[in-house]
């Protein structure tokens, strides 16, 4: 199993709108692609003094499945234009981890 981890930050004012966009459009759009080997996504949120940090953790069965999602340059962040407009900054690259243990 591969976990794809990415970070983005919004202003305090844009945080709720960004989260709604993810849940209503972005995550649904990913699921609707029916990528073989895609196993879901988790969203983490943490408020800081002047911004809100979001972390996505996507789950795939293999790097081939990650490539089916992100393309050959699979570490490149996939951030739709609507999402970019609500973000103050974001990682240009995603990190990929081999899941060694999962007791969820």
State where each predicted segment sits.
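Short, surface-exposed ligand-recognition loops at beta-strand->loop->(often short) alpha-helix junctions
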Residues: 9-22
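Intrinsically disordered, low-complexity acidic/polar segments
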Residues: 15-17, 65-67, 103
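Exposed boundary/loop context
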Residues: 1, 30-33, 44
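Non-catalytic surface loops within mature trypsin-like serine protease
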Residues: 12, 60-62, 98-101
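An amphipathic, aromatic/His-enriched active-site/gating alpha helix that lines ligand/cofactor pockets
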Residues: 24-36, 59-95
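Glycine-rich beta-strand-turn "strand-cap" elements at beta-sheet edges
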Residues: 39-52, 78-104
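Short, well-ordered beta-strand segments in beta-rich or mixed alpha/beta enzyme
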Residues: 3-9, 40-74
């Amino acid at each position: 199993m591969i976990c794809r981890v990415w970070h983005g930050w919004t202003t305090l004012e844009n945080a709720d709108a960004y989260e709604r966009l993810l849940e209503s459009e972005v995550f649904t759009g990913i699921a609707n692609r029916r990528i073989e080997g895609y196993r879901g996504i988790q969203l983490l949120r943490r408020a800081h003094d002047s911004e809100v940090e979001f972390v996505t953790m996507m789950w795939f069965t293999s790097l081939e499945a990650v490539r089916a999602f992100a393309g050959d340059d699979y570490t490149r962040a996939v951030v739709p234009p609507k999402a970019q407009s609500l973000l103050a900054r974001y990682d240009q690259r995603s990190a990929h981890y081999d899941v060694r243990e999962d007791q969820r």
